[in-house]
UniProtKB/Swiss-Prot annotation:
It comes from the Eukaryota. Glycans are attached at residues 246, 264, 298. Residues 21-168, 169-304 form the 6-Cys domain. The keyword Hydrolase does not apply. It is found in: Cell surface; Cell membrane. GO terms for cellular component: cell surface; plasma membrane. PROSITE patterns: 6_CYS (PS51701). This is Surface protein P12p. The keyword Membrane applies. Gene3D superfamilies: 2.60.40.2860. Keywords: Cell membrane, Disulfide bond, Glycoprotein, Malaria, Membrane, Repeat, Signal. Disulfide bonds join 25-60, 74-144, 93-142, 173-208, 223-285, 234-283.
Amino acid sequence: MMSIYFWVAIHIFSSFWMIQNIEICDFSRGSLDVALMNNKILIDNNLKEENYNDNNIKHCVIFTKGLEIFTFICPKGNNNDNYKGVEIRPEQCFEKVRINGKEENLKDILKGVVIEKKETDTEIIRKALIPPTIYQDMSFECSCDNSLTIKDNYIGARGIMKVHLKKNIIFGCDFNYDSNEPKLSNGKSAFAQFYDKQVVDSNKNIICNTQVNNKEVYLGLVCPEGYGMYPENCFENVLFEKKVINITELIKHDVKLHIEKNKNISFASFILNPNENPKSFSCHCIKNNDNSFPLIANITFSNYESYSFNFHVTYLILIFILLISYI
C-alpha cells in the first residue's frame, strides 16, 4: 500500500516533518551516571583523555543520506549529584557541531536543516531534521559530557553522538544557490541542477530539466526569496499535463516529504522498482503569484537499471539472430 508520510509541525518553521526514520541518541537513561562507573580515581587527578577507558565513553553512531529526524538527549544536573557537572558540547548542539575537531554552523553546511531545542526539569533535548543536501561524505559530533562530575572518587562518563553523512544526489533544482556565502562546500551542491541567485532574473523564466537515473530517488526544489512554490505543497502535489495532481497518482510507492513553506524548500524521497520509470511532472517557482516568468523544474525518469536491462536484451537478440543465421 502506498502512502505519504509527513507531520504538520506547529512551530516557527511552519514545516512538514516526515514521521519515519527517527534516530535517537538518549544519554539520559543512566548510562553516564557517576554512580554506575567502575573506574575509581583520585580526587586530585586531572581529568585528561588518557584517564578514560571504554567504560567512560558511550557511543551513539548514526549513518544517513538525509530526510531523517535526529534527537539528542542529555541529562540535566540541577539537584542531581550524579550529573552535577554534565555539559553539552558544543553547547548549542545541532546549531553548532564539531567537524574535524572544529565547531561549525550546521546550517552553513546543510541547506534546509531545521533545528529545535527544548528543556525539561531533567533533560536537555535537541532535535534536527537532516535534509538530503549532503554534497560530500562527512561526519559531525555532539557530546553529553559528565566527566566533570565526581562523587565518592568516581567520575561520570561521556556520551558521544557521531553522525556520518553520506553523499547524496538530489534530482531537482536549487534556484537560490549563493556562491558568495561563506561555506565549506567550495562551490559544491547536492542538487543535480543549481543556479546562483545573483543571476536569477524575475523578468526571465528558467527551465531546469532533471533526469532521474536511479531507483533510490531524492527530489528537491528551492525557490528564491520573493517567489513561492506552485503547487503550494510541491512534491506532495505536482503539475502533470497542466493539472495539479497528488504525487501518489504517479508514484505508486511510499513517499516521504519535508516541506518548508516559509523557506520555499521542498524535498521528497521514494524508491522505485528496477527499470520503473514514472511519467514526468514539474513544479514551478512563481513571483508574487504571477506565473508570467516562472522558474520551472521538470522531473523526468530514466531509471538507471533500465539501460542495463535494454542493453542485455538487445545483446541477447543479436546473439540469437547470429545463431539463426548459421543454422
